[in-house]
Amino acid sequence: MNHRPKKRFGQNFLQDRQVVDGIFAAADLQPEDRVLEIGPGLGALTDRLLPEVARLHVIEIDRDLGAGLQARDEDKLVVHLGDALKLDWTALLTDPPYKLIANLPYNISSQIVFKILDHRHLFSRLVLMFQQEVGERLCAGPGSKNYGILSVLCQVWFDIRRVLRVPPGAFYPPPKVHSAVLCFDALAQPRIVVEDQQFFRRVVKAAFAQRRKTLRNSLTGAGLGFDGLEVSLLDAGIDPGRRAETLSLEEFGKLAQLIQPHFV
């Protein structure tokens, strides 16, 4: 298929067979598996996945590419035309669990991750391509310069590991950055107790909003300060003068629990 990549959709089509095979291997697909692919593009991954699974849903925003996918005479293939950020995944994926496999458009990859977190009950495993820098952030631990919002939020719910490094030449057109494929395995139980996911996310975002500031200043600046904040932090064993990047998942859990009663 002759198709000119569209910059507005962040299209960099995967064309390296070894990378496709590596993604396929990481997915560990079984004949009964149901899979969601976001951004199938020219179909390099789609062609590899389709013969091996019970059902393959694909979400494609480019109607030209979507028409080509819809023209395939494949009962197992379900094509959803539209923006993955706007479509209702719960309505589309009615018989979970699914495996999510995608070469994500880099301009929306972080937004897609937040949507995945909101729909994590739908998925047992994710195998996702990211810009290398984003991949490093997702895998980073406390004390690392790459440790941040995505690290904390994803590691609460998933085991994450890098399975492939991918050079620009694996794509057409080649991006200006290197890429990484990560595998996320859903945990049976989160690593910490999260009573209110949205409030927990709010606290984590506030703590990292200004990385060079202390927790005391970051939380207050984000509207999460209250009388007695410092005492509450100290009682929880958290120095108010620390920075967010030094906190463990457990400490973020404590932080959310001690702040939330003041904002109910």
Swiss-Prot record:
Xref: PROSITE patterns: RRNA_A_DIMETH, SAM_RNA_A_N6_MT
Subcellular location as annotated: Cytoplasm
Gene Ontology CC annotation, any one: cytosol
Main EC class the enzyme belongs to: transferase
Record-linked InterPro entries: KsgA/Erm (IPR001737), rRNA_Ade_diMease-like_C (IPR023165), rRNA_Ade_Mease_Trfase_CS (IPR020596), rRNA_Ade_methylase_Trfase_N (IPR020598), rRNA_adenine_dimethylase (IPR011530), SAM-dependent_MTases_sf (IPR029063)
The family this protein is said to belong to: Belongs to the class I-like SAM-binding methyltransferase superfamily. rRNA adenine N(6)-methyltransferase family. RsmA subfamily.
Record-linked HAMAP family: 16SrRNA_methyltr_A
Entry protein name: Ribosomal RNA small subunit methyltransferase A
Lineage, top ranks: Bacteria, Pseudomonadati, Thermodesulfobacteriota, Desulfuromonadia, Desulfuromonadales
